[in-house]
Amino acid sequence: SLDGEDTSGWNAENWRKRRTKLQAVFQDASGTLNPMRSVRSNVEEAMVNLTCLSKRQRRERIGELMELTHMEERLLDVPARQLSGGEQRRLSLVRAMSIRPKYLVLDEVLSGLDLISADAVMRVLEQYHREFDCAFLLITHDMDSAYRLSDTILTMQAGQIVRVGIKQ
């Protein structure tokens, strides 16, 4: 369910209408980015399609999110294909957060990042949660990051929930 609505019978149109509430960031960020487009264009595309912000408001929000994710402004006009893996992952986060969703699905977003980059991404997520009251569904094998970012942790095995824990 999403906001109390049963989603089991939803078609593509139902999901499309609710994309502003729910966004996802995947382990392979390059799959959600257009490698030929600039960083700015990749983010603005989502904002144009899913928000009613003016061009000025979009530019301001992109600047704020670039700063929040510690991405240099000079990267705005660089094609996404020229970014490192960590930068692509952060750009994917910027893109998802740019429309201010209520829910973020984070699929192995820390996987493959060095410790410094992973910590930076976790700090971004913690700050974003505090500022915008966004809930996360964090899919990870890293129990330390799960504990750091989660209130409730479900442990799954073979597709089944085997344990539920609430952080105290």
Residue ranges of model-derived segments:
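Conserved ABC ATPase "signature" region
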Residues: 57-74
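ABC ATPase NBD coupling module
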Residues: 6-23, 41, 49
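H-loop/switch region of ABC-family ATPase nucleotide-binding domains
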Residues: 140-141
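Conserved ABC ATPase signature
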Residues: 79-83, 87
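A short, surface-exposed alpha-helical micro-motif characterized by mixed small hydrophobic
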Residues: 146-148
